[in-house]
C-alpha cells in the first residue's frame, strides 16, 4: 500500500510571511517540515486507519500550506464563514455515496485535499504552549480524519475525533497536550 502526498507549500515559499514568522519564532519552533516527514505521517496514519476505507493499492492526497488570507477566502467560499480557520478538508470520498469494494490496483484512490493555515497554526501553538510542528501535526491528523469520513457534529463525535487524533499523533511520535478543551 502506497500513499502519494502532493504538497503545495504556498506559505513557506512566500518570503514576506516567512520573514514575519521567523521574527516571532523561538528556537523550539522549527519549520518548514520536510516532505518526507509529512509523507511518513500520512502513510503511518493510512496504515492504522486502512480497515475503515475502500481497499486500494495506492492512495493519494494533497496538502496545501497557506496563510490566513488564502484560507479565509476558501473558508468563505466553501463554508460561508468569512474568517480564517486553522484547517480545511475537502474529501473526495463521500460517506453517503457507495464506493467500490476494490479499486483497480493500477489506479490511485484520491482521498482529497487538506489546507492548513500556518499563520493560525503558529498562533494556536503559542496559545497551547507547544512547538509549531506539534500543532501542524494535530491539524494534519484532523484534516486526514475528515478525508476519511470523520466529522464532529456534536460533542460526542468531537470527543471521539479528538481521541483518534491523539492516537494518531502518538503513533508518529508527536506528543500533544490539550490545554484548551474546546479544541
From Swiss-Prot:
Enzyme Commission numbers on file: 3.1.-.-
Family to which the UniProt record says this protein belongs: Belongs to the endoribonuclease YbeY family.
Keywords carried by this UniProt record: Cytoplasm, Endonuclease, Hydrolase, Metal-binding, Nuclease, Ribosome biogenesis, rRNA processing, Zinc
Binding-site residues, Zn(2+): 142, 146, 152
The protein's name in its UniProt record: Endoribonuclease YbeY
Gene Ontology terms for molecular function: metalloendopeptidase activity; RNA endonuclease activity; zinc ion binding
GO term, biological process aspect, one: rRNA processing
General function of this protein: Single strand-specific metallo-endoribonuclease involved in late-stage 70S ribosome quality control and in maturation of the 3' terminus of the 16S rRNA.
Cofactor(s) the protein needs: Zn(2+)
Cofactor binding: number and manner: Binds 1 zinc ion.
Enzyme class: hydrolase
Organism annotation: Trichodesmium erythraeum (strain IMS101)
GO cellular component term of the entry, any: cytoplasm
Any Pfam family hit: YbeY
Residue pairs linked by disulfide bridges in the UniProt entry: none
InterPro entries registered for this protein in UniProt: MetalPrtase_cat_dom_sf_prd, YbeY, YbeY_CS
Annotated compartments: Cytoplasm
